Amino acid sequence: MARISFSYLCPASWYFTVPTVSPFLRQRVAFLGLFFIPCVLLLLLIMDLRHWATSLPRDRQYERYLARVGDLEATNTEDPNLNYGLVVDCGSSGSRIFVYFWPRHNGNPHDLLDIKQMRDRNSQPVVKKIKPGISAMADTPEHASDYLRPLLSFAAAHVPVKKHRETPLYILCTAGMRLLPERQQLAILADLVKDLPLEFDFLFSQSQAEVISGKQEGVYAWIGINFVLGRFDHEDESDSDTSVDSAAGRRRTVGILDMGGASLQIAYEVPTSASDLPPKQEEAAKILLAEFNLGCDVQHTEHVYRVYVTTFLGFGGNFARQRYEDLVLNETLNKNRLLGQKTGLSPDNPFLDPCLPVGLTDMVKRNNQVLHFRGKGDWASCRTLLSPLLARSNTSQASLNGIYQSPIDFNNSEFYGFSEFFYCTEDVLRIGGHYHGPTFAKAAQDYCGMAWPVLAQRFKNGLFSSHADEHRLKYQCFKSAWMYEVLHEGFHFPYDYPNLQTAQLVYDREVQWTLGAILYKTRFLPLRDLRQGQGGVRPAHGSWLRLSFVYNHYLFFACTLVVLLAIVLYLLRIHRIHRRQTRASAPLDLLWIEQVVPMIGVQVGP
């Protein structure tokens, strides 16, 4: 039987040989690979940078959040780098002293001092109030310093003794002192300037005790709110809303609306470029506009602001109700005399007041004259009756009482409403916060249309805010209509204006105008650190970190690209060497076939 055997010995190159590819095609593949890899890296770089850019505002917001949390902690009086300042608010009903502190300035002339309210060991704000107002010293001005002694002693106990001599003291008097004759004002201030330095060694001079105007008080309130909201921090805010002054290139500030019991105030930033106005309006605008620089260097203009501020006496919620009652009383009595009626003269024949809840009875006394009211809860009719109290003029650029109002860009503005703006929306209606005109109007109208017994029962059941009382329930219908008319008819806010926030606290704390006052009064203090070379002019630490972060990202991707290119070049080099070896072994393979194949045939036998 014949036996056939085969040899499986083959050249080693046969086991690794791939189908032949033309050199031109291999070059194209290599070129596409070299082109594709950088494109992918570039795409990843762009995506990462976009993520980094969007994360910066979040990081900065987180930093601000941590700073706000730190503001609520007890002040470390052992820190030698802290500075202190005192502001006394001498109001009409009493006086309060506020203690503020701030760390050493960071040396950047573009930054403001980081002023915060001092907190004691229990993390409570360091503030003290006494009554009555300092205007009670009008007949005995020599006792004015005795009147303020408890406040200053309180502050001296909280400020470290070694810091007293460098702690500025500002005594700022408001409404109560404004009503006094100038002679009495000067006598009270003179006693303070003369006697207080004898007992307290705070940094205090004659210019630091004054009676401020309503305009100054409004500007200080505007400064304080915007400072707490971080609107004066212009660093890394490219994604924020644009300023009302497009040429400034900075964050948009907020306007404030504040309706108290007796007065109403509005303040907001206006563009520095004044529009063409008639001579009378231009003169009025100059009186109502305040332009100031919060920066320490007058050559730097990023903190120059132009603010419109006006106070309307008699337009507060309680005073407006009195004006309304006087108007109704006079008109009703005159109508009774002309028509021989007795409307409102007895509880059985009351005046039907659309501004009171349904069925609520009330009574008004004026000069031995009595008028009886009964609510009928018609919110729309109430608004109509309130319209004459706005005292508007036919001029398009006039607001309440015919006073000039600088134009507001309602498409690029933001406002915060305090006091009555918050109470009207929150205490009873429970819709405080973001204000929406139609929603508020519907809620106010529904409330006014409810029967008084139903509202009283809801109050007993605790369905309203804990701050609501019987007075709020009785006059909520009136005050909501008054607030609505003032906002939309008086100040010309659109009914669907989306950027009004009603609030009582800002970041869980009450913001006083005194904060704005000390910010403005101490604006030049950073120059001391700059001149002494304490820190010098340098970018903020956060900016350095962000620049370093960008540099590291670029360096990482550059190194990655170099490594990948080196790998590609190495693979190409290996491929070329392998191809040369394959070509060199081809003749040997042919020779091997010629020699071995015949031997295979010989092994085949019978």
From Swiss-Prot:
Kindly state the tissue distribution recorded for this protein: Widely expressed. Expressed at high level in brain, kidney, liver, testis and small intestin. Weakly expressed in lung, thymus and heart.
What residue intervals traverse the membrane?
Answer: 29-49, 549-569
Q: Which GO terms describe its cellular component?
A: cytoplasmic vesicle membrane; nucleus
Q: Which subcellular locations apply to this protein?
A: Cytoplasmic vesicle membrane
Q: A single GO BP annotation from the record?
A: regulation of immune response
Gene null: resulting phenotype: Deficient mice are born at the normal Mendelian ratios and grow healthily until 16 week of age. Normal lymphocyte development is observed. However deficient mice shown an increased in ATP concentrations in the small intestinal lumen and increased numbers of IL-17-producing Th17 cells in the small intestinal lamina propria. They show increased resistance to Citrobacter rodentium infection and increased susceptibility to experimental autoimmune encephalomyelitis.
Species lineage, top-down?
Eukaryota, Metazoa, Chordata, Craniata, Vertebrata
Q: What class of enzyme is it?
A: hydrolase
Q: List the disulfide bonds.
A: 448-477
Name it.
Answer: Ectonucleoside triphosphate diphosphohydrolase 7
Q: What is its EC number?
A: 3.6.1.15
Query: Which keywords does UniProt give here?
Result: Calcium, Cytoplasmic vesicle, Disulfide bond, Glycoprotein, Hydrolase, Magnesium, Membrane, Metal-binding, Transmembrane, Transmembrane helix
Q: Which organism is it from?
A: Mus musculus
The residues forming the signal peptide are none
Which residues are tagged as glycosylated in the record? 330
